[in-house]
Regions:
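Conserved class I S-adenosyl-L-methionine
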Residues: 1-53, 85-88, 95-98, 104
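Conserved Class I S-adenosyl-L-methionine
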Residues: 3, 62-64, 204-286
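Class I SAM-dependent methyltransferase SAM/SAH-binding core
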Residues: 54-56, 62-119
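A short acidic, Gly/Pro-enriched loop at the edge of an enzyme's catalytic core
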Residues: 116-129
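Residues lining the SAM
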Residues: 131-135, 165
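A short, conserved alpha-helix within the catalytic core of class I
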Residues: 137-151
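Helix-to-beta-strand junctions that scaffold the AdoMet/dcAdoMet cofactor pocket
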Residues: 139-140, 156-158
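Conserved catalytic/acceptor-binding region of the Class I
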Residues: 147, 153, 159-225
Length: 286
């Protein structure tokens, strides 16, 4: 159960944190990615995603949102910089057919790299771009999303919808109290990628800088629920939001701090439950 939730950014001095990227990708796919399913469903319903949709998913991760769009009949392309997550996306969207079986549905494309690498001169322009990896928790995430949009929007037709997602107000997101651990542990590095509270106009500012026309917005309840504290720690670390703290200390120390911060959200049966609200913005390509 999502951006992100903001993922695979480099830590201070450009060096990656000391983590097992394969294990982290599996934790993202198996634990954390589904947390944003209500967001995906709401957007797909509102925009009537279906057989006429040609979708480009930015930071598509292990492909759950793409799979949900594909089951509605959309032609989907996903792009991401994480080979570990994309390997899982390919397993979901491009499974090996059984011998003699006929392929069902429309083919998906999974692209490693940047949006520019998803260009296909032989295919029609995209009419929907999604950036479901939520911004609003890192000092540098809006700028990074802007860079992706600068490459992606030329691949879309005029009037195409562009969906941006972000964390809601800290007071509406119980997970914010846990994410403050990231800021405290990363503080010695003064890292540009460390956590910060979401701001009200984060999404609007990104859309305006990208030259998009704002066309609507909404809020969606996306509670984070975990079977136990260990699953919660693994899921949250898989987002990448704690990478600066891991670089400043180590993964074990960060895990202990996160587990302690989760105690107020632990229920009598051992499960962890944190209500959150996420925002989405719909903009249009001019």
């Amino acid at each position: 159960m999502t951006p992100t939730l903001v993922r695979h950014h480099l830590s201070h001095a450009g060096s990656p944190p000391r983590v097992n990227l394969g294990a982290r990708a599996r934790d993202w796919s198996e634990i954390q990615e589904r947390m944003l399913v209500p967001l995906y469903e709401t957007v797909h319903e509102r925009l009537e995603v279906g057989p006429a949709t040609r979708l480009l998913g930015l930071r598509c991760g292990s492909g759950l949102a793409l799979l949900m769009a594909a089951t509605r009949g959309a032609a989907v392309t996903g792009v991401d910089s994480s080979p570990e997550r994309l390997a899982l996306a390919r397993e979901r969207l491009l499974p090996d057919p059984a011998p003699g079986a006929r392929a069902r549905g429309r083919a998906a494309r999974i692209v490693e790299g940047t949006p520019r690498d998803a260009a296909d001169a032989q295919a029609p322009a995209y009419n929907l771009i999604t950036a479901f990896d939520p911004i609003g928790c890192r000092a540098d995430d809006a700028g990074r999303l802007g860079d992706l949009l600068a490459e992606a929007t030329p691949l879309a037709e005029v009037g195409a919808a562009v969906v941006l997602a972000g964390w809601g107000p800290p007071e509406r997101c119980a997970t914010s109290s846990v994410l403050r651990v990231a800021a405290r542990l990363a503080d010695p590095l003064r890292s540009a990628g460390s956590w910060r509270p979401a701001r009200r106009d984060d999404l609007e500012e990104v859309a305006q800088r990208a030259g998009l026309r704002i066309d609507g917005s909404g809020r969606v309840s996306c509670p984070f629920g975990y079977a136990d504290v260990d699953s919660a720690v693994r899921g949250l670390l898989s987002t990448g939001l704690f990478d600066a703290g891991i670089s400043a200390t180590d993964e074990e120390q960060v895990g202990k701090e996160v587990a302690e911060a989760l105690h107020p959200h632990r229920r009598a049966d051992g499960t962890v439950w944190m209500p959150n609200v996420f925002r989405y913005l719909i903009a249009r390509v001019r």
